[in-house]
């Protein structure tokens, strides 16, 4: 059952400010309404005790604080009567004025009190108890407070929301109105974060049209940000940027060229010429890739002392574990120990885990302090299970915290490095440039760095192509495991994964196999079959839990066989509405107790508890199940493997149903059974690495529902999604010959 709320309007006087977060403006007020005292919560860019306000919002219930009025918009009414003036001044909003002084000011000046407070300290000093010096301070306090108020009122009249007003004031100070009036496009800067299209509207509503150069510069940065955060490009070829920006901004390429140079001189962009062509970066993207390049070279210059009896140590491990390493596996172990830095790559069944365990055993025998890390919670959990040693997410390892602009920073950094002597990092293909730069900066000099990944998978959701660029640079030791071991050769999942990588036709004709293709010619038929497999056939035949064991992976969100439509169908089948299941609407989504959900963006602020510990942070791609919805408090309790997190209603806008997810979102996870629609795949997603990534998510069973022709077409298309990045170029462009000459295996 669900609960809905209608918007209400409440008028009253602010009696008390019970809590205020100065960083984001979140405030808890006590508001007097007639004879009642209510609690109001929301974003207030500026508010004072004694003010008369009109609040628009809805009633909610908090488990700890009870009934609250959640404010979505508000208007303030300036005190008009002498009684309202007294209440406002007596509340202590202005420094130097208490109850007695407030009474004397109102008695002397009446309804014109604010006029004297604003500009006439000489008259104010005639009030008993106020010296000329005190009058100056009182007037200064009043002007300061009402300057902020005037600023926010002006900005809000331009169509800028309370949260954005606060961010703009924090970024630009008391001159913010002047800055915004002259150049509204400063609102596009990351520390404020107003989207470019909205700023265009704001600019149209200003009294005077701003200088067009401001617009063009902001448009150039907007294009680069979109390419960075949406498409993963860390840079764009300059000629392409000029062409795209000129068309987008309805100007000419020469003007864009001049503005790009100016942005570079202002240290907002970087333009760098490499051997092939010139590329343009946002300043932070360039710094991240340059930092990675520099730190890699530093680590290469601090190799560990060689191990004299390595062959005998490897033989001891083989005897103890009753195994026999292949030559490439031995090479990987020796390289990890002697070089101190290694990329270990290879597909399923090639022995990466066995090799990793050997490296770990040798590091432990040397008495090294070892840390294990992975980009996601699921990948870290799997790493822990495979090695028997705790692995942490990179964010947790680096001890994430917030800066003054609510952006994540890390306690562990170049000034406060990690205390480990060896770091083993899994799923490197998922790690973007920003996170990898932060991780490398936190490594102490001499720390060994072992990186595992599969370069045939999709690039990371974030910016860059770290694993690919590191391998292609040929600057680091790389061992690629290709031999499929006997125990994996019976698996068609493993066999077909390697056939896909080689562009060969998959094998699906074994009835007792673990890989099946079910021919369906249309998306509608594919969706119908997927629903039957998910809800009925696989649970009955394999005793699989639909929620915990089966995952539908789609190339895209759209279409009848996309995640949006399939999630609606699967939710109705495996978790239909019920009188004993609470529901909650958040944004445009309906969530129900028992739903499978996914976090779709990093949130470093959500609290979670487990049997062993508690912490903050649920990250992009984490999958959980809604265990309970409390309608009174409008909160949901969601289990993410061994952690339980509590979500407020507004935080649930960061969730999506996860019965079906995109292949991109599945990176770093494994599932007992995977079902994938492959029918009418759009050309932009008809790639080999997307199909390969989906297949390698399956541990026990892989079912493709679609057409063989479409599967063949995807497997044949080895053109990987184009990503502009400069890491490889930076690694090679200024690499010293001595370093290049010492990194071969």
Label for each model-derived stretch:
Residues 1-312, 745:
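Accessory, non-ATPase domains that flank or precede helicase/AAA+ motor cores in DNA-metabolism machines
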Residues 50-52, 594, 621:
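Loop/turn positions that initiate beta-strands
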Residues 312-340:
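Conserved pre-motif I regulatory segment
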Residues 330-333, 338-511:
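ASCE P-loop NTPase helicase motor core
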Residues 455-616, 627:
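Conserved helicase motor core of P-loop NTPases
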Residues 620-745:
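C-terminal accessory regions
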């Amino acid at each position: 059952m669900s609960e809905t709320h209608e918007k209400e309007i409440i008028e009253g006087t602010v009696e008390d400010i019970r809590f205020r977060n100065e960083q984001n403006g979140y405030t808890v007020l006590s508001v007097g309404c007639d004879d009642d005292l209510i609690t109001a919560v929301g974003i207030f860019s500026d508010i004072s005790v004694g003010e008369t306000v009109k609040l628009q919002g809805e009633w909610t219930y908090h488990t700890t604080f009870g009934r609250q009025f959640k404010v979505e918009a508000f208007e303030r009414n300036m005190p008009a009567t002498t009684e309202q003036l007294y209440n406002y001044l007596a509340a202590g909003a202005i420094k130097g004025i208490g109850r007695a002084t407030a009474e004397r000011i109102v008695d002397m000046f009446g309804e014109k009190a604010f006029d004297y407070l604003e500009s006439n300290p000489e008259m104010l000093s005639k009030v008993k108890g106020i010296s000329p010096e005190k009058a100056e301070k009182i007037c200064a306090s009043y002007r300061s407070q009402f300057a902020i108020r005037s600023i926010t009122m002006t900005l809000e009249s331009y169509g800028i929301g309370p949260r954005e007003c606060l961010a703009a004031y924090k970024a630009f100070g008391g001159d913010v109105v002047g800055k915004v009036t002259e150049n509204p496009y400063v609102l596009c800067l990351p520390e404020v974060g107003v989207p470019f299209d909205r700023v265009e509207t704001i600019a149209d509503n200003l009294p005077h049209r701003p200088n067009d150069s401001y617009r063009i510069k902001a448009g150039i940065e907007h294009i680069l940000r979109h390419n960075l955060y949406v498409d993963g490009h860390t840079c764009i070829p300059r000629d392409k940027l000029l062409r795209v920006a000129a068309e987008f901004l309805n100007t000419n390429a020469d003007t864009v060229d001049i503005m790009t140079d100016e942005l570079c001189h202002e240290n907002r962009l970087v333009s760098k010429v490499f051997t092939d062509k010139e590329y343009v970066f946002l300043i932070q993207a360039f710094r991240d890739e340059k930092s990675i390049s520099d730190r890699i070279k530093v680590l290469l210059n601090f190799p560990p002392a060689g191990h004299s009896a390595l062959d005998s140590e490897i033989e001891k491990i083989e005897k103890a574990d009753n195994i026999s390493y292949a030559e490439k596996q031995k090479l990987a172990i020796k390289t990890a120990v002697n070089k101190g830095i290694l990329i270990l790559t290879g597909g399923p069944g090639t022995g990466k885990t066995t090799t990793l365990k050997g490296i770990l055993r040798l590091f432990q025998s040397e008495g090294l302090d070892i840390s294990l890390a992975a980009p996601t919670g699921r990948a870290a959990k799997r790493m822990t299970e495979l090695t028997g040693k705790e692995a942490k997410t990179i964010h947790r390892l680096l001890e994430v915290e917030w800066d003054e602009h609510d952006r994540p920073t890390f306690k562990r950094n170049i000034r406060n490095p990690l205390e480990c002597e060896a770091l083993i990092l899994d799923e490197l293909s998922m790690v973007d440039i920003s996170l990898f730069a932060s991780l490398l900066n936190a490594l102490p000099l001499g720390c060994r760095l072992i990186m595992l990944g599969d370069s045939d998978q999709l690039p990371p959701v974030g910016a860059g192509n770290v694993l690919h660029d590191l391998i292609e640079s040929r600057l680091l030791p790389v061992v690629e495991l290709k031999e499929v071991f006997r125990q994996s050769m019976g698996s068609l999942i493993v066999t077909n994964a390697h056939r896909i990588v080689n562009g060969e036709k998959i094998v699906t004709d074994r009835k007792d196999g673990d890989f099946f293709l079910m021919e369906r010619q249309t998306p509608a038929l594919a969706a119908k079959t997927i629903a039957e497999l998910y809800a009925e056939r696989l649970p009955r035949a394999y005793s699989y839990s639909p929620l915990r064991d089966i995952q539908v992976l789609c190339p895209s969100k759209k279409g009848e066989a996309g995640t949006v439509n399939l999630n609606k169908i699967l939710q109705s089948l495996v978790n239909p509405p019920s009188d004993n299941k609470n529901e909650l609407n958040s944004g445009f989504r309906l969530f129900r107790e028992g739903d499978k959900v996914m976090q779709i963006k990093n949130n470093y602020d959500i609290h979670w508890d487990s049997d062993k510990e508690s912490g903050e942070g649920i990250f992009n791609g984490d999958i959980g199940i809604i265990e309970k919805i409390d309608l009174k408090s409008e909160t949901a309790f969601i289990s993410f493997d061994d952690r339980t997190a509590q979500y407020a209603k507004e935080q649930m806008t960061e969730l999506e149903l996860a019965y079906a997810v995109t292949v991109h979102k599945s990176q770093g996870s494994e599932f007992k059974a995977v079902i994938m629609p492959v029918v009418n795949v759009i050309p932009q997603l008809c790639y080999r690495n997307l199909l390969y990534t989906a297949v390698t998510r399956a541990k026990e069973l892989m079912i493709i529902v679609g057409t063989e022709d479409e599967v063949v077409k995807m497997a044949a298309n080895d053109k990987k999604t184009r990503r502009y990045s400069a890491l490889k170029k930076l690694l090679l462009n200024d690499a010293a010959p001595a370093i290049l000459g010492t990194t071969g295996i």
